Amino acid sequence: MDFNPSEVASQVTNYIQAIAAAGVGVLALAIGLSAAWKYAKRFLKG
């Protein structure tokens, strides 16, 4: 197995992008859930 710096760099970039995408997804989910929770509490109180 030979060492190819550009291949390693592209794998690292893909890995970082995957982590960033997951982080954005979790953040969006958390914001959506908190907004839905606030709306639901207001709605249930009447």
Swiss-Prot record:
Location in or out of the cell: Virion; Host membrane
Segments on the Cytoplasmic face: 38-46
Bilayer topology term: Single-pass membrane protein
Gene3D superfamilies: 1.20.5.80
Transmembrane segments: 18-37
Primary localization class, coarse: virion
Gene Ontology annotations for the cellular component aspect, listed alphabetically: helical viral capsid; host cell membrane; membrane
Keywords: Capsid protein, Formylation, Helical capsid protein, Host membrane, Membrane, Transmembrane, Transmembrane helix, Virion
Keyword Flavoprotein: no
Residue list for modification N-formylmethionine: M1
Positions on the Periplasmic side per record topology: 1-17
InterPro entries: Phage_M13_G8P_capsid_dom_sf (IPR023390)
Top-rank taxon, per record: Viruses
Similarity annotation: Belongs to the inovirus capsid protein family.
Annotated function: Self assembles to form a helical capsid wrapping up the viral genomic DNA. The capsid displays a filamentous structure with a length of 760-1950 nm and a width of 6-8 nm. The virion assembly and budding take place at the host inner membrane.
Subunit structure and binding partners: Homomultimerizes. There are several thousands of this protein in the phage capsid.
Protein name per Swiss-Prot or TrEMBL: Capsid protein G8P
